[in-house]
Design a protein with these regions (language model features):
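Conserved catalytic core of sirtuin-type NAD+-dependent deacylases
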Residues: 1, 5-177
Length: 177
């Protein structure tokens, strides 16, 4: 029995749903220098800018829906064991119905401790009414909540898990990256 095990999805997967990409012309990096909003140093220099940047990205999720590509991947789970390995930080795979997802770059709908970002005790899933994180909002360890995003210069906590799945995959498909 063949097992379609893994799919790697990137920005192109969610662009069709209306999610802004980072690298395309007119993308997020044209409007926000990467070193300001996607590095630990940028966060240390101006946490308010970084928090607001990701608040705006979260709000964008309220206006978009999964596209047919997300839905088709979710439908594959009816007949195959599927793991979606995604570089996307949105929640469109979950909303489409995929149940086994590895987020390489973090998850926009979660926040974590500024001191210990990948400690599972301090990671919190936000409800849509909580998407507006403010300076002063604290994690369980008393530090400022920060986006649960793997920034440039940080090691992603899910990379080893993803490698294990990819190595065991009968088929590996790359979509939108």
């Amino acid at each position: 029995e063949m097992c379609i095990r893994d799919r790697l999805t990137g920005a192109g997967m969610s662009a069709e749903s209306g999610i802004s990409t980072f690298r395309d012309a007119g993308g997020l990096w044209d409007r926000y220098p990467v070193e300001q909003v996607a590095t630990p140093e940028g966060y240390q220099r101006d946490p308010a800018l970084v928090i607001n940047f990701y608040n705006e990205r979260r709000k964008q999720l309220l206006d978009v829906t999964p596209n047919r590509g997300h839905e088709l991947l979710a439908e594959l789970e009816k007949n195959f064991r599927v793991t979606v390995v995604t570089q996307n930080i949105d929640n469109l795979h979950e909303r489409a119905g995929s149940s086994h997802i590895i987020h390489l770059h973090g998850e926009l709908t979660k926040v974590c401790s500024s001191r210990d970002p990948y400690n599972p005790h301090y990671i919190k899933e936000l409800k849509p009414e909580e998407y507006e994180v403010k300076l002063g909002d604290k994690a369980g360890d008393g530090t400022q909540l920060r986006p649960f995003i793997v920034w440039f210069g940080e090691a992603g906590p899910e990379i080893e898990t993803a490698i294990q799945y990819v190595e065991k995959a009968d088929i590996f498909v790359i979509i939108g990256t």
